[in-house]
């Protein structure tokens, strides 16, 4: 999760919503991909940290099946990212801060509990939640000032 926080800090420095994601091989605990939100620079709403990390991981291992991998994200995934996590079959999801507005894991939609979801990862929340929340608060304060 520390590396995901570093990625979120990079996003913050680039005036992107500070979310970072890291995908880790469960067998050897090595990071295979890492990313941060990049929607502003790419001018594309799909460039969330999770989507970029999943795309890169699939490219690296030449497979759409990430069942031997875990994802660490600084913020509770939105519906789009939760669906991508399910479709790529990531084994475990670790996330930091809850997202009361757009979170789709435990805060609002609860995508993984829906009938539309065919794969439910193990979910662990609250990992470095305070650090993640402080980054988010700092970012939105910065853009309001």
UniProtKB/Swiss-Prot annotation:
Protein name: tRNA-specific adenosine deaminase
Cofactor binding notes: Binds 1 zinc ion per subunit.
GO biological process, one term: tRNA wobble adenosine to inosine editing
Residues binding Zn(2+), per UniProt: 48, 78, 81
Family: Belongs to the cytidine and deoxycytidylate deaminase family.
Keyword set includes Metal-binding: yes
CMP/dCMP-type deaminase domain location: 1-116
Purpose of the protein: Catalyzes the deamination of adenosine to inosine at the wobble position 34 of tRNA(Arg2).
Gene this protein is translated from: tadA
Enzyme's top EC category: hydrolase
PANTHER family reported for this sequence: CYTOSINE DEAMINASE FAMILY MEMBER, TRNA(ADENINE(34)) DEAMINASE, CHLOROPLASTIC
Active site, UniProt feature: 50
Keywords, ordered alphabetically: Hydrolase, Metal-binding, tRNA processing, Zinc
One Pfam family, short name: MafB19-deam
Cofactor(s) this protein cannot do without: Zn(2+)
Record-linked Gene3D superfamilies: Cytidine Deaminase, domain 2
Enzymatic reactions: adenosine(34) in tRNA + H2O + H(+) = inosine(34) in tRNA + NH4(+)
A GO molecular function held by the record: tRNA-specific adenosine-34 deaminase activity
Domain of life: Bacteria
EC number: 3.5.4.33
Subunit structure: Homodimer.
């Amino acid at each position: 999760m520390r590396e995901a926080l570093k990625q979120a800090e990079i996003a913050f420095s680039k005036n992107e919503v500070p979310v970072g994601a890291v995908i880790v091989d469960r067998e050897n605990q090595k990071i295979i991909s890492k990313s941060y939100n990049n929607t502003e620079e790419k001018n594309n709403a799909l460039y969330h940290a999770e989507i970029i990390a999943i795309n890169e991981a699939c490219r690296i291992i030449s497979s759409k099946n990430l069942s031997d991998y875990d994802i660490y994200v600084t913020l509770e995934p939105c519906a789009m990212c939760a669906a991508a996590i399910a479709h790529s079959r990531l084994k475990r999801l670790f996330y930091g801060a809850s997202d009361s507005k757009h979170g789709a894991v435990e805060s609002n939609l609860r995508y993984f509990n829906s009938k539309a979801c065919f794969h439910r990862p193990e979910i662990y929340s609250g990992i470095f939640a305070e650090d993640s929340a402080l980054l988010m608060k700092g970012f939105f304060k910065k853009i309001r000032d």
